[in-house]
Amino acid sequence: MFKNRKSIAILIAAVSITMIGFSYGSVPLYRIFCQVTGFGGTTQVADLESDILTLKDEQQENRIITVRFNGDVSDTMPWKFHPIQQEIKVMVGETALAFYSAENPTDSSIIGISTYNVNPQQAGIYFNKIQCFCFEEQRLKPHETIDMPVFFFIDPAILDDPKMSDIDSITLSYTFFNVEDL
């Protein structure tokens, strides 16, 4: 009987530890899943040297797409966060640079991390970010304001996708979360 209680206690402890591990790992695992599959409008990350050089060699049409920017914060994140430009017009295959502004109005340092997506969702696989603040955590000191860049391009392969022929605007949206809440 004592062995059964000990086995049950070990089993309960193992299940509890596993559940806690899954809860901490779910956000990064979901982000990786979305990045690999393009699920949920997740953008692609470009390799600057290979992708940009390939783009310069490819014949590009003069198609212009309007990229709109959106910025939100979670309910528990006290930052003020917004895009500096509301929208820009981007020629397919050419790089573009946009900025978001984040302000920490509190009296303590806060570390934030952002999630992002693209709408319409099917455009996510063609939206390639070369450099982005979303690739790592951001620490803002008390009352600090920073401008954060997003360097990107829209893959010319979008021109070959018949489902994307009527798309003339894409929205890039970020939501910042307090790292302590994750």
UniProtKB/Swiss-Prot annotation:
Belongs to the COX11/CtaG family. GO terms for molecular function: copper ion binding. The lineage of its organism: Eukaryota, Discoba, Jakobida, Histionina, Histionidae. It comes from Reclinomonas americana. Its main location: mitochondrion. The gene is CTAG. This is Cytochrome c oxidase assembly protein ctaG. The keyword Mitochondrion applies. Residues 1-7 are mitochondrial matrix. Residues 29-182 are mitochondrial intermembrane. It is a single-pass membrane protein. GO terms for cellular component: mitochondrial inner membrane.
